[in-house]
């Protein structure tokens, strides 16, 4: 542990505490309407296969670093998507489908967000187009295809895939 504490990476204070920014939970939450948060919780917790992700107490690390508590939020089993981003894209698909009905959803992504959107679309039986840059790995593309998404590889970087997504989405 002593070697880790002396390492260059560890000495960067923002790794543990960003002294230039103080997190104000109430201010951040004031930008999200409470009813929206309540709606998301109610919707997501009703999805088949939902369970709260466990918090794992890292007591040995607590003791070594002198902190009262350190927890690890284990998202590994979140709808088998293994990502903390698994909820946002799928919830957006759910919300839009509730308002618009039978639609095709589309997004640009480099990976996890696209998997979430594809999973949400598959769950609701919707068509899904995922635009990725040429630099996204075939493994990531295949993971989205396995969720029935039409994966479109675009020459260029993420911004190019986003522009193509917007362009294609405007077509009827």
Where are these regions (language model features)?
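PLP-dependent amino-acid enzyme catalytic core
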Residues: 1-172
């Amino acid at each position: 542990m002593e070697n880790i504490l002396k390492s260059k990476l560890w000495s960067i204070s923002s790794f543990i505490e960003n002294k230039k920014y103080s997190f104000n939970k109430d201010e951040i939450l004031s930008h999200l309407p409470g009813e929206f948060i309540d709606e998301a919780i109610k919707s997501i917790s009703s999805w088949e296969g939902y369970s709260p992700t466990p918090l794992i107490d890292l007591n040995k690390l607590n003791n070594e670093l002198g902190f009262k508590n350190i927890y690890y939020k284990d998202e590994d089993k979140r709808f088998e998507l293994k990502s903390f981003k698994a909820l946002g894209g799928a919830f957006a698909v759910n919300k839009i489908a509730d308002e618009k009905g039978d639609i095709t959803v589309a997004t640009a992504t480099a990976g996890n967000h696209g998997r979430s959107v594809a999973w949400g679309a598959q769950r609701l039986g919707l068509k899904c187009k995922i635009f990725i840059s040429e630099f996204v790995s075939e493994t990531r593309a295949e993971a989205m295809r396995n969720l029935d998404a039409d994966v479109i590889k675009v020459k260029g970087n993420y911004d190019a895939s986003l522009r193509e997504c917007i362009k294609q989405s405007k077509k009827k």
